[in-house]
Amino acid sequence: MAAKIIDGKTIAQQVRSEVAQKVQARIAAGLRAPGLAVVLVGSNPASQIYVASKRKACEEVGFVSRSYDLPETTSEAELLELIDALNADNTIDGILVQLPLPAGIDNVKVLERIHPDKDVDGFHPYNVGRLCQRAPRLRPCTPRGIVTLLERYNIDTFGLNAVVIGASNIVGRPMSMELLLAGCTTTVTHRFTKNLRHHVENADLLIVAVGKPGFIPGDWIKEGAIVIDVGINRLENGKVVGDVVFEDAAKRASYITPVPGGVGPMTVATLIENTLQACVEYHDPQGE
């Protein structure tokens, strides 16, 4: 069996085009364009690349993109003050603070300072709690992007045994909640999990998010499984690979996401979707 490739790049472009059309319709109707504030503290090269891609995506769909590039020396108090100002700014629908933050700044305190209705990353405890209670508002971008991929490929998830490898706050934990909503029987594995291979071999739907190149051998994959590889790892030779041994896994899976070009583009596309949602559902004047 040769797996069908889940083309995240193409689906992400579709999502962005749909958002762009809705933005044009808003402007034609006399409403303002959605606004996203992107905050970067310090000069981490990887963060600079991520931030640039998010700003570019914003501008492509017709959003107002506001950039705040703060020096490494920025204090926690100064950053919180900026977030307070952006919370109060009626032209800003989404606030994104790029992680990791420099030493001395409390990530949790900063993320919790963003108003839940402007938390387009979906990391605020309120939004995570809503997802847990089956009443999601703004949903974490990578898990929601993965659900969008499954939906666009008409993959029926009800009753599947889903296994999530990795229990991070950004992917693993919220992903498990999305999968419960999608009707899966869900297992989350982590560093203390015994006999990881057993869990992988029984997974109808496998989502791997650990950040270790080739962590899951292809021969562990169940015949006909759906494999979603969230890992983005750069090898010493410059090649970018996922957490799953792609060539071997693709021989056994029914569907698989490539790296690059699978989950990565969906994260940014979902950020754009979330910003439009925040604008339309939480910040537009009611009744218009």
UniProtKB/Swiss-Prot annotation:
GO CC terms: cytosol
Pathway where this protein functions: One-carbon metabolism; tetrahydrofolate interconversion
EC number: 1.5.1.5, 3.5.4.9
Coiled-coil residue windows: none
Assigned protein family: Belongs to the tetrahydrofolate dehydrogenase/cyclohydrolase family.
Subunit structure: Homodimer.
Protein name: Bifunctional protein FolD
Classification of source organism: Bacteria, Pseudomonadati, Pseudomonadota, Gammaproteobacteria, Enterobacterales
Gene: folD
